[in-house]
Amino acid sequence: MGFGTFVRVERRERGFGLNEFARRLDISPAYWSRIEREVEKPPKDELIERAADLLGIGRDDMFIEARRFPPDMKNDVVTAIRAYRRAKEVDG
């Protein structure tokens, strides 16, 4: 299941219509419909966070569905990758 399908299921389970949901996010219903139909890629981080809050879903869970690292983890991941590569170089 892709991000759009996941969000559509969650939105419907919580009783939000597409127009109401988009209005609360301050975006066009047409744009959100394209996201839910997987025509558009998942939106920018800020919109993912706002949608998660509106749906009562953990932000980390929404980013996982979008196949992204949560913004607060990005630096940690980069640091971990660099440390791993340095350790591999030392070990040869």
Residue positions per predicted region:
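Short, charged recognition helix plus adjacent turn
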Residues: 61-92
